[in-house]
């Protein structure tokens, strides 16, 4: 007993000694703020500054003397990018960096299902953790202002409420893996043309009402640990060191406690970077002033020049303590988080998640019969068609490649052609139909006319003998398409696809058009193509998702997260002169102001070809008459709107019920209506469910520039229950007191 007592006493003393020797910053049982304070007190000025800039293409330094590790970052709103060389953009050619390519974020937004966002964030977080990444550069929540923006496919559509609701679960689930979301591009990076210097000018109202809400939700609701600054200027000052957007709004108003990281090469001035809210400077070509073959990370704006300014007293020491504290907080949450899971990559669970997200995001734009009183063309009945011709470069193209920083190295990729052949077998033949060039960034192949003519002629000849033609076309992720670094050059389909569609229709009316893109396109043939599917960029399981929808194994339930204008000038950004879009290369003005997307179409009475929120099903839904819980809402009260929705078809389906609110009379211009709530409802054949939405005074407010505050004006309002922004199923009126 005595020996046991002595052993216990010795063990207790040993534990006490070890505990006493463990610095607070290394003790993960301590609060993060205590750890940050302790680590900061032990660091030299040089060590603090070293945290603030890159040490390689995708990493920033830790504090080796204190055992604080570096931060590793990776591109990847929809997949973890393959390993990049230490000091240039070349791929490192690892053999173990293949991953799951998830659907692009336009597809995720088109699910209108926050559960899919959570599933997405969880899976991509597990892959990033397995790849030992601390910061994932995504999600992107810039608003879809124009269909010409080459990077729209990385974002979540035109509506700030939809983007807000869909980004939050992604961020929360991602960060449960000890991987920081880096929400981008803050703010107003709404075009790629001249993105590095274009000076965006706009009203405070449109900034707060349209372009900031998703970022605000990411910070205040999602708890995002980092934010990426944009390349562009905002009212004369670069977004990566913009005092108004970073210090006042992000850090003061929203109480953001994380890091602001530049887009690569987005810093331009040491003093502004020091005092205007930037925390970590990353760069495309070291500091932008030397060739990337030269190792000059110490010449970054937030490196030696910043250190010298601090020593000379030209910037306050408080700036470096704030930056270092934020970076340490990020490191403790990620690289030094001992509770983080191990992670996994390219698992069956992840493939299943990618497939399900694709299934829920694919949008059935049109599904008409070929002959009057006939059945709609979709789904494709295997017993009805013996010869199915699949046409199109996108049917076989690896759409995980290209696009700039979104390029992915998928472990397994199922093409649309492979997916359809898995269902329909040897009934499926293939013709390329058009050429689209090699996957490249920054340039595009020229396609000889004889190649264009030959491929089209082959497809048309084969279409004559087919029972059904499925054209898988759209855009791709090459330069001047859906790609970083440049905007589209035309609103119409590229590579002669309009002519191909006309030629195919001339020999076979049974045409299903599948558009793979992250943008709207012009459709001069829309009235004559019986079935049109918006298929997005679907990732690893894209072919399976597409086959699930076309075959009817899954009933489509996606709805558009942005409007499809009939012509480009029907889009608000393009309804004015070039100063509105693309600008004069120096500056631009958002002349449509708050009337972005469906807000423009509604208010200006310019019908969209396919409206925001539109999406068909293989079943049908009816809506009952909506009922409000009261005739008026008190200033401190709420009001509910309830509507019954019934599946009147013969198969199960999901309907997205949308609630918009409009102000009957206001002292400032307001859109006809704005999205405030939505619900995705699963219904069996014949089943009916009631959907209830709760409105609060916040749902009725606009940003008042005179008082720099959100307010509503008492009066009459309408709540619109809709199947899309243009398909109003019921209206209830109420008063706001």
Task: Label every PLM stretch briefly.
Residues 1-23:
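Bacterial Sec-dependent N-terminal signal peptides
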Residues 17-702, 709-726:
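Glycoside hydrolase catalytic-domain context in secreted enzymes
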Residues 727-737:
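Short beta-strand elements
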């Amino acid at each position: 007993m005595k020996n046991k007592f002595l052993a216990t006493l010795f063990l207790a003393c040993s534990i006490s000694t070890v505990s006493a020797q463990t610095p607070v910053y290394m003790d993960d049982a301590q609060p993060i703020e205590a750890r940050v304070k302790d680590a900061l007190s032990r660091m030299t000025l040089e060590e603090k500054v070293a945290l603030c800039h890159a040490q390689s293409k995708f990493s920033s330094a830790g504090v080796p003397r204190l055992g604080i590790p570096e931060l590793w970052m990776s591109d990847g709103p929809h997949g973890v990018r393959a390993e990049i060389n230490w000091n240039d953009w070349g791929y490192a050619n690892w053999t173990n960096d293949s991953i799951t390519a998830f659907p692009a974020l336009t597809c995720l937004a088109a699910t209108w299902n926050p559960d899919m966002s959570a599933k997405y964030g969880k899976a991509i977080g597990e892959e990033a953790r397995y790849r030992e990444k601390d910061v994932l550069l995504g999600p992107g929540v810039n608003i879809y202002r124009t269909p010409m923006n080459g990077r729209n496919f990385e974002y979540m559509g035109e509506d700030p409420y939809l983007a807000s609701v869909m980004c939050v679960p992604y961020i929360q689930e991602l960060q449960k893996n000890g991987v920081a979301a880096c929400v981008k591009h803050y703010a107003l990076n709404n075009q790629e043309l001249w993105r590095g210097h274009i000076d965006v000018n706009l009203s405070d109202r449109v900034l707060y009402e349209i372009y900031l809400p998703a970022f605000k939700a990411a910070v205040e609701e999602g708890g995002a640990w980092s934010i990426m600054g944009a390349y562009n200027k905002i009212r004369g000052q670069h977004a990566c060191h913009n005092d108004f957007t970073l210090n006042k709004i992000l850090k003061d108003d929203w109480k953001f406690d994380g890091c602001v990281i530049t887009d690569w090469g987005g810093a331009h001035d040491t003093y502004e970077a020091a005092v205007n809210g930037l925390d970590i400077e990353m760069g495309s070509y070291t500091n932008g002033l030397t060739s990337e073959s030269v190792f000059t990370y110490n010449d970054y704006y937030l490196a030696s020049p910043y250190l010298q300014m601090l020593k000379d007293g030209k910037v306050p020491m408080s700036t470096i303590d704030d930056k270092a504290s934020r970076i340490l907080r990020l490191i403790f949450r990620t690289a030094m988080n001992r509770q983080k899971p191990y992670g996994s990559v390219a698992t069956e669970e992840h493939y299943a998640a990618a497939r399900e997200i694709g299934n829920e995001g694919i949008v059935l734009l049109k599904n008409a019969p070929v002959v009057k009183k006939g059945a709609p063309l979709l789904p494709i009945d295997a017993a009805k068609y013996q010869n199915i011709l699949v046409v199109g470069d996108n049917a076989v193209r690896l759409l995980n490649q290209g696009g700039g920083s979104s390029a992915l190295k998928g472990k397994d990729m199922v093409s649309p052609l492979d997916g359809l052949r898995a269902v329909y077998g040897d009934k499926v033949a293939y013709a390329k139909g058009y050429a689209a060039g090699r996957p490249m960034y920054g340039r595009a192949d020229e396609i000889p006319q004889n190649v264009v003519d030959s491929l089209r002629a082959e497809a048309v000849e084969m279409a004559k003998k087919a029972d059904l033609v499925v054209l898988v076309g759209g855009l791709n992720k090459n330069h001047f398409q859906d790609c970083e670094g440049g905007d589209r050059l035309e609103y119409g389909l590229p590579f002669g696809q309009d002519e191909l569609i006309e030629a195919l229709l001339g020999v076979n009316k049974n045409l299903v058009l599948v558009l793979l893109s992250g943008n709207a396109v012009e459709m001069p043939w829309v009235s004559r193509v019986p079935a049109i599917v918006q298929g997005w960029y679907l990732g690893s399981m894209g072919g399976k998702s597409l086959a699930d929808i076309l075959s009817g194994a899954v009933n489509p339930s996606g709805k558009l997260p942005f409007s499809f204008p009939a012509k480009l000038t029907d889009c608000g950004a393009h309804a004015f002169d070039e100063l509105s879009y693309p600008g004069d290369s120096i500056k631009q003005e958002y002349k449509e102001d708050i009337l972005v997307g469906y807000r423009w179409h509604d208010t200006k009475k310019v019908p969209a070809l396919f409206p925001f929120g539109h999406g068909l099903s293989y079943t049908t839904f009816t809506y009952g008459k909506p009922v409000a819980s009261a005739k008026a809402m008190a200033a401190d009260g709420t009001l509910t709107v309830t509507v019954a929705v019934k599946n009147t078809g013969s198969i199960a389906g999901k309907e997205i019920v949308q609630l918009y609110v409009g102000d009957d009379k206001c002292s400032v211009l307001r859109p006809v209506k704005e999205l405030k709530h939505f619900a995705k409802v699963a219904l069996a054949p014949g089943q009916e469910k009631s959907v209830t939405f709760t409105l609060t005074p916040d749902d009725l407010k606009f940003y008042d520039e005179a008082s720099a505050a959100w307010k509503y004006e008492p009066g009459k309002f309408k709540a619109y229950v809709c199947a899309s922004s243009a398909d109003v199923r019921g209206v209830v009126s109420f008063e706001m007191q």
